């Protein structure tokens, strides 16, 4: 990164930010699809039932905790690789 000039660093930073946004949107979309499919099954009303609401809360919590844990493991692996260098 030190070898890049200011313009190149800005371009690189912009690419990183775009990738992060794309990854976030993919995660969000996956969360919505999975939890909706698992929890919402009564289409007779446009309002969620209390059961569906509870299921959606638990599903999203579980999904986000899992994603956080995976991220932590990646950070640990990355740190271990950096120490080996």
From Swiss-Prot:
Give the species this sequence originates from.
Answer: Yarrowia lipolytica (strain CLIB 122 / E 150) (Yeast)
UniProt entry keywords in alphabetical sequence: Chaperone, Disulfide bond, Membrane, Metal-binding, Mitochondrion, Mitochondrion inner membrane, Protein transport, Translocation, Transport, Zinc
Domain comment (free text): The twin CX3C motif contains 4 conserved Cys residues that form 2 disulfide bonds in the mitochondrial intermembrane space. However, during the transit of TIM9 from cytoplasm into mitochondrion, the Cys residues probably coordinate zinc, thereby preventing folding and allowing its transfer across mitochondrial outer membrane.
Question: How does this protein assemble?
Answer: Heterohexamer; composed of 3 copies of TIM9 and 3 copies of TIM10, named soluble 70 kDa complex. Associates with the TIM22 complex, whose core is composed of TIM22 and TIM54. Interacts with the transmembrane regions of multi-pass transmembrane proteins in transit.
Where is motif Twin CX3C motif found? 35-59
Q: Where in the cell is it found?
A: Mitochondrion inner membrane
Q: Does the keyword Transport apply?
A: yes
**Does Chaperone count among this protein's keywords?**
yes
Which Pfam families does the annotation name? zf-Tim10_DDP
Function in brief: Mitochondrial intermembrane chaperone that participates in the import and insertion of multi-pass transmembrane proteins into the mitochondrial inner membrane. Also required for the transfer of beta-barrel precursors from the TOM complex to the sorting and assembly machinery (SAM complex) of the outer membrane. Acts as a chaperone-like protein that protects the hydrophobic precursors from aggregation and guide them through the mitochondrial intermembrane space.
**What GO molecular function annotation could you give as one example from this UniProt entry?**
protein transporter activity
Query: Can you name this protein?
Result: Mitochondrial import inner membrane translocase subunit TIM9
Disulfide cysteine pairs (residue numbers): 35-59, 39-55
Provide a GO biological process annotation.
protein insertion into mitochondrial inner membrane
Q: Which GO CC annotations does the UniProt entry carry?
A: mitochondrial intermembrane space protein transporter complex; TIM22 mitochondrial import inner membrane insertion complex
Q: What gene name does this entry carry? A: TIM9
PANTHER family reported in the protein's UniProt record: MITOCHONDRIAL IMPORT INNER MEMBRANE TRANSLOCASE SUBUNIT TIM9B
| Family stated for the protein in its record | Belongs to the small Tim family.
């Amino acid at each position: 990164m030190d070898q890049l000039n200011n313009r190149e660093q800005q371009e690189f930073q912009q690419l990183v930010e775009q990738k992060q946004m794309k990854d976030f949107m993919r995660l969000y979309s996956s969360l919505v699809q999975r939890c909706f499919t698992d929890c919402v099954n009564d289409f007779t009303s446009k309002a969620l039932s209390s059961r569906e609401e509870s299921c959606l809360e638990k599903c999203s919590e579980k999904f986000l905790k899992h994603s956080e844990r995976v991220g932590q493991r990646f950070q640990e692996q990355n740190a271990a690789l950096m120490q080996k260098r």
